[in-house]
């Protein structure tokens, strides 16, 4: 099954999408990667969904990526004696470590590390910013606040602290257990929530031990400030606009999104734009015009993937949501201005031989009637480099490793094909042209560009570029064996 678009679609699974028929229908509607949210569901639930995805993959003979999204250190208030209280603007309100049920004057905040980092003037945002508190004075186990934006506060509502880099590890004990479980299960990507510093990613990578690629979620102001350092140690990025829009002014999120996407593209690392993309489709079969424009904007920016959360996990119309996203992507990529927008934001990087080879491959493809760029890759790195160029022709990612094929399902423009391990260059050329023909990218009369590394099966050796005819009879006998 060949996609007719470059941008990928990530669909979150949940109660509305947990059976074989629905998951298969989501894939056939356009989902390329499935997200398993570790914040919801038991390990048994997650394992059951993982098993179904792999069954769909086997039945349709197409590599499918799986992304496990770790919960992260979510901060929450305690409980109230009456379950909820109304906070009035200007009133005093205290948060502290006492486990006593809350009332209209105080509630537990069971996170001593927060109090250690707070200073007068800091803000506490409750329930996605619907309630705002200003810290007036604080100590090691309390903070006396004034209510700047009132509202109803109830049990276990989330708390954000936008003004402070909190001394919290990005991985809670639950996250560590979930990470190990997900890696043992065989997921392809791990999304790390509430990253604040590069050390958070390094810690997760040390625990994953190469079993899954690490995707850093940018959803804290501290992560935006440390973005370049975080990007360097990550395999990919998710622009998680939900908490980002709570802790920062909402009008600042679009330019931040644009900067994060461009930075990831320049680094040749996949980037997902996520959160509330088609939010109204949780209840409605048709999205708003603004939501469609939001998805389109991310595609024009050159994001590798756009993501559905509750729309596909718990909404009434999960398949329609994926189909809508697919249709928007197809429409954008057919727009005559799309190419000029993508090309204008391309970052030229010529630091290595591999950089030069993939840039030359794109230029050759655009200057001639080349039908596709095929690249052999053990790790997926060459596929990332080719995708960074955002070529005008499809990318055929050839690898003998199913794990690499699944990870590249997230990469812009990449069509993953499992091949036999190659030892000789001529065999690689023949394998590439057969893949191009068999998957509908080219006919016998056409040509493709091939990139590879010799010796084969060695990471980071991209050093050959070949223009190859798709008619095997025309492949030169003087090609190196």
What role is predicted for each listed range?
Residues 1-481:
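Non-catalytic helical/linker scaffolds that mediate oligomerization, partner binding
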